[in-house]
Amino acid sequence: IRDSTIICNITSNYGESLGNASSVQKVFKNGKIYATRSRESMKNAIMTQSGMYDDLKVVVDKKVTQKEVTEKLNASNCKALEGGYMNTNNLTVIRKSSFYLTDAVACDEFVNETRFHNNLCLASTYARDNGINLQEKAGESGLMPYQYEFDKSLKKYSITFDLDKVGVDENFNAEAEVSEKIERVNLILETIENLSLVVKGNLDNAEPLMIFGGIGNCKTHYFDNVVNVTKSTLKITDELIERLNKEDYKIAFIEGGN
C-alpha cells in the first residue's frame, strides 16, 4: 500500500448556487463548519493533469454517459480506467479504483468571505454598440451583479494506492506489464507534487506544503486521523511519532513561511 496525507493551500470548490450567489462546499464536524474541496474534484484534476485521461473513451447508451469498456479496452491497457469504472452497455461490469482520495478539508474553521462582482465591461460594450443608455436600461444591456463565497486555506487530504490492484482488470482477466503499472503510479505522484487547481478563475499552486506517507501494509489512509494542523501549526502527538517510526514512512515539508 502506498499512502500519503497531504497539507496544501487551495481554494474550495462550489456546491449548488441560489440565483447569482454561489456557496463553497462545506462539511460539519466537531460542532464546526469547514470548507472543502471534494474528492471528485481532486481526482479529476489529478487524472487530467497527469495525462491519465488522455486515452479516455466515452459512450452514451440510453442517455447514460459512461466510460467505454470492452474486452479489448480495459484497465490493463487504458490508463483512464485506472480510476475505476461502471459500464452497463451489455452486462454490468464494475472495477473499483486502485487508488482512493479523501475530500480536502480545511484545517481551520470556515470564515465567510463574500465577494461581489458584475459584468459591467461586457454590458457597457453591448450598450455602446447598440446605442443603449446603460444607466436607464441596465437590464436591456444585460448588466448583472453576482456574488460568491471565497475560501482559500490550508486543507488536508489523503491518497492511498492498493499497489496490488494497479493495472489489473479482473473482469477480463487482464493485467498490465510491471513497467506500465510503475508508470501509472509515478504519473499520479508526480502530478500531486506539482498540482495546480482552477476554480472561478483562481489558479492555485496546490503542491504539498507538508506530506506524510510511504509504503506499508495498512490498507487505509494511515495518517489521516493523526495529522492535525490548526492555525498553521502541526500538533505533534505520540501516535503521530509512533506511526512515522513504523515501516517505511517519512515526513517532508516546504519551508516557505506558510
Go through the PLM ranges and name each one.
Residues 1-258:
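RNA-binding basic/glycine-rich loop and surface signature characteristic of RAMP-family CRISPR effectors
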